Every structure is written in structure tokens, then in C-alpha cells.
């Protein structure tokens, strides 16, 4: 597969972005604007928003995927309604597992919790929908495992140093 994990930010670069975006927002100086950081702002949206919780992706072929970055599905919008697509087994597994991690600096089932994505795809029978370079979920998650381990230490340190204060939003399935 052509996905280049060496293009992911290092844990040092990601930690820098964590601090820099908050500085830009004005929390510690800078301008009074609200910049978003897709990877590090899980605390503001209650973790991963994908899998139909607040968001899904429909690719050019019509496959309804949990996220623009996660190319697995068992539903196509050309064959089922959006409501039916949101009820596909993979999306139901997302809802059952969310939040994927109580540390919202590690919300993603692919980048920070790849073992969970692999389990969900395998258990639901979802198929690769990558139009350019399909790959097995084992291959994809195997490429993300080192990244997840490296980021975990930094993310846990940041989470402990800066306690989660944005508890007003979660909308998770009741467990």
C-alpha cells in the first residue's frame, strides 16, 4: 500500500502542535481565534467523531466509510439509504467502542488504538474501500502500531498535566 506513515508527525512535532494551537487560540498568548487541530482536539469534541457519531465519509464510489482516513465499509449509498448505511455493522461497532480511549489526545481507532480498528473490521466483515491502493486491516494497523506506542507516552503526560476540562460534550452510546 502507498500510505506513507513516515509522513505522520513525530511525537515531538505533535506535542509542539498541541502547545502551539493552544497558544494561537489565546489560552497562553497570541490571537483570540479558535484554530482547530484535527489530531489533538479530541478533548473539545469528546474524542473520535467518526463512525456516524457526528461524521462519516462517502467516497467517490459511494462507499460509506467511518472516516475520510479509514477506508473500510459494508455499505454503499447507491444501494442503501444513508440511515441504513449508518446502521452498518462497522458503524455500530464504532458506537459500541466509543470512546476508543479515555485520553482524548488518543481518540483515533486507527492512529492511536489500531488494535481496536482491526478488531472492529474483522468482527464486522467490512471490506477495504480504498480505490487507489486497497490493503488489509492487518497491514494498515500494523503500520500504525509503532506510532500509537510512541505517541501514548507523550499523550498521557499531556493529559495528566492538562486535565480534561471540556466535559460538556460526549454523546456516546449508553453502556
Regions found by a protein language model. Name each.
Residues 1-47, 51, 60-61, 65, ...:
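Radical SAM enzyme [4Fe-4S]-AdoMet core and its adjacent flexible, acidic
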Residues 69-175:
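Flexible mid-to-C-terminal extensions adjoining Fe-S/redox cofactors in radical SAM and related proteins
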Amino acid at each position: 500500500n502507498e500510505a506513507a506513515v513516515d509522513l505522520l508527525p513525530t511525537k515531538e512535532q505533535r506535542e509542539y502542535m498541541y502547545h502551539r494551537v493552544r497558544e494561537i487560540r489565546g489560552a497562553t498568548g497570541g490571537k483570540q481565534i479558535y484554530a482547530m487541530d484535527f489530531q489533538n482536539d479530541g478533548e473539545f469534541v469528546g474524542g473520535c467523531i467518526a463512525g456516524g457519531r457526528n461524521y462519516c465519509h462517502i467516497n467517490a464510489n459511494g462507499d460509506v466509510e467511518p472516516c475520510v482516513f479509514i477506508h473500510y465499509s459494508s455499505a454503499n449509498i447507491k444501494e442503501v439509504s444513508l440511515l441504513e448505511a449508518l446502521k452498518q455493522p462497522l458503524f455500530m461497532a464504532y458506537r459500541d467502542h466509543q470512546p476508543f480511549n479515555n485520553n482524548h489526545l488518543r481518540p483515533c481507532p486507527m492512529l492511536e488504538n489500531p488494535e481496536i480498528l482491526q478488531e472492529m473490521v474483522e468482527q464486522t466483515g467490512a471490506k477495504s474501500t480504498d480505490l487507489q491502493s486497497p490493503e488489509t486491516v492487518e497491514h494498515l494497523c500494523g503500520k500504525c502500531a509503532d506510532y500509537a506506542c510512541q505517541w501514548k507516552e507523550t499523550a498521557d503526560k499531556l493529559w495528566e498535566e492538562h486535565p480534561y476540562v471540556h466535559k460538556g460534550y460526549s454523546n456516546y452510546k449508553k453502556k
